[in-house]
Amino acid sequence: MKLSVDWLNEFTPLSQIPFEKVLEKINTSICEIDDVEEFKSHLSSVITVKIKSLEKHPNAEKLQTTIATDGSKEYQIVTAATNVAVGDIVPLALPGTKLDGKEILDSELRGVRSQGMYCSEKELGMALESSGVLILPKDTTLGISVRKYFLWEDTILTIDNKSITHRPDLWNHFGFARELASQLQIPLHHFPLQADTKWESGNQGLTVEKSEHAHAYYVCSIQNVNITESIPKIKSRLEKCGIRSINNVVDVSNYLLLELGQPTHFFDRSKLQSTSFTVSKSKEGESISLLDDTSPTLPNHILLIQNGETPVALAGVMGGKDSAVSESTKEIVMESAVFKREDVRYTIRKTNIRTESAVRYEKGLDSYTCLPVMKRAVQLLKENGNPNVKVFEPQGFNHTESKTVTIETNLSFLRHKLGKKISLHEVTDILQRLGFEVTTKDESLSVLVPKYRQNYDVTIPEDLVEEIGRTIGYASIRTEALSMAVETPIRNPLRELERRVKQFLALEVGFNEVYNYSFASPTDAKLEKEFEVTSLKIANEMPEEHSLLRNSLYPGLIKQTKVNQDRFEKVNLFELGRTYHKEGNDATLAQEKRWISLLSLSKCKPTDLSSIEDEFLTVRETISELFLFLNLPKFEWVKLPRTHFHPNASLVLLYDGKEVVELGILHTRFADLYDLKRRAILSKIDMEVLVQIWETYGRNSHFVPPSHFPQGQLDLSLIMNESDPTESFANLVKTLRIPELESVFVQTIFQGESVGEGKKSVTYRFILMSYDKTFTQDRFKELSDRLVETAKSNGYSLR
């Protein structure tokens, strides 16, 4: 947002305060300033001169030689302009001036000295194109800067919008001046909302139907309108704030927006089809032609202004083209309204149209200004080329006219929250300067919030603390050490466990942690079929891809993988996060579950099933190592199908009979849905179940000294059906309770012609360890024979 210091001075005497102090107070007590600049400072050396003589250039047919005077000094200027004549007053850029990035020089043009350059509107930044030198009125004072002539001598403050998004009262010059006056303790001496305007009796047939879709809505009829240019003051102020002048009626609407922050709109009455107005909502497929020459097709529930049955404006956003003010306009209808900020935000989001009016409405305006702004508009219309307008009584409604906000608090609360001892007199003085009405009894305060601050801004005692704190300056609050006792924090087992799991995944096995939004699309919600019915829709209107709270961490990991699959051969990701589920029809809160989910993207082609199975087993081994890292060795892998996994690659890890982990290869239909080019291996760990198991079995580590004897290993290759789970034989061996057996795992899996169609060769590796003696060849043979016998007796054949 841009603010004119000259305009602010109209309301409060900022010129009496050192400018550096004003800037400091804004930054420390009100908002951040992005930039401070002198408006069109590069034109300071462009002055007004009068052409005294004009002759043909002796050496160039298309050039002319002129003598111009600023009243005290003469300049010889060579020009190619054909629209200048003796006696014309024109702008002259003196040597050293920079226009369009080029410096004007005292130079010779075809042998004749030229001491500057006459300027067009384009070169002064007043128009995109111009056909010749700008000719100024005959009564223009000579020798003055064009900055002074066009009222451009001003300093412009660019305010960071984010820092005042909660302060709609500051989105205008009067509101900002009012705030500055209170902070700098200087008076306000101009009150535009107190304009003295008399209405003509009657309403000229206009009617407004009451509507629940607006806080307030008024219209009035204005006759004897003359369309012309705006006066210099209004044109220059609009330009300094980045708004192009249109005409003396439309400019008043824009001027009011910048002066008071209250949007208004003017309709050409001759173009209206009816005398009745109402605020309603659109129907699917309805269309309206807007001032920006677009005709959007509207969805349901867009807020509209209806004239009879015809939509004439997107309420709070933009007016319609068919009822716009034009050069032939003689009678207008003025609109002043306050719409619900939720409705305006919905319109912005659905139409992607954001205007200065919409920005202010979406912050939440109070309706008390609607009628005073109409009076101020009439005053400006009369000043701006329409002294004879007749304005008839406004028609409309105001649903929130009597709204008040009173906050009860006490001095001890304010002192405690501020961290500073402050007197009751000081508190009262600060709040009253800021426009609050304060009633005190002993140390209790009853504070009536001013109307321009009561909408979504100051509503609770903590807001008063902020008002006092920023006014006295946060730097004045002394820094003190914490006065509370330093105690050992309460142990949080879940946080401890999460830290250990993240340490293992990130540091031990090289997975990368990611963070994803907690929002999901309807498509994402269908990935884990068991959770689809528990999906929660976000109450606030959101784009479809973010319309639900996530019920699974998998979609976020898959989307991250999709982005990175062409950049990296190896993609191993994990995320620690919450999912949200509907607990029941009567539940008021969502059920939150905490998970760690993993994704490992295969490095192989989707058709290389043997290599993919090896990678799947590697991930399974990684999770097994995690449980050993957590001192939880007594786990069991069991085949259990999941709809989102491949039917032959879906496992769960059980511990003490409880399901803790699921692991599988993402089903091809989901891989295709998310455009994954390679197979993805997914897993998730239920952290709530895991922490219970870890607290019960894993926290107390027991040191087992290493054996003094070397370990041995046996490999056994078996032929089995392609669909047989590899863990079946491993689990069978564990039931033999061989005392020397430390672990068993799958070393390799092979498929090919040599093992037969529909078959696979699986090589198991058995790690053997004795703690009291060295293995002998006889014991190795005995164990090997026992394993072979077990395999054969259970239907497996040796390879």
Swiss-Prot record:
Residue ranges of every copy of the B5 domain listed in the record: 402-479
Residue ranges of domain tRNA-binding in the record: 40-147
Family affiliation: Belongs to the phenylalanyl-tRNA synthetase beta subunit family. Type 1 subfamily.
Protein's organism: Leptospira biflexa serovar Patoc (strain Patoc 1 / ATCC 23582 / Paris)
EC number in record: 6.1.1.20
UniProt-listed SMART domains: B3_4 (SM00873), B5 (SM00874), FDX-ACB (SM00896)
Cofactor: how and how many bound: Binds 2 magnesium ions per tetramer.
GO biological process, alphabetically ordered: phenylalanyl-tRNA aminoacylation
Subunit structure of this chain's protein: Tetramer of two alpha and two beta subunits.
Compartments where located: Cytoplasm
GO cellular component, one term: phenylalanine-tRNA ligase complex
Keywords: Aminoacyl-tRNA synthetase, ATP-binding, Cytoplasm, Ligase, Magnesium, Metal-binding, Nucleotide-binding, Protein biosynthesis, RNA-binding, tRNA-binding
Binding site for Mg(2+): D457, D463, E466, E467
NCBIfam families found in the cross-reference section: pheT_bact
Lineage top rank: taxon: Bacteria
The reaction(s) this protein catalyses: tRNA(Phe) + L-phenylalanine + ATP = L-phenylalanyl-tRNA(Phe) + AMP + diphosphate + H(+)
GO MF annotation, one: tRNA binding
Coiled coil: none
Domain FDX-ACB: 707-799
Broad EC category: ligase
The protein, known as: Phenylalanine--tRNA ligase beta subunit
Pfam families documented for this protein: B3_4 (PF03483), B5 (PF03484), FDX-ACB (PF03147), tRNA_bind (PF01588), tRNA_synthFbeta (PF17759)
Cofactor: Mg(2+)
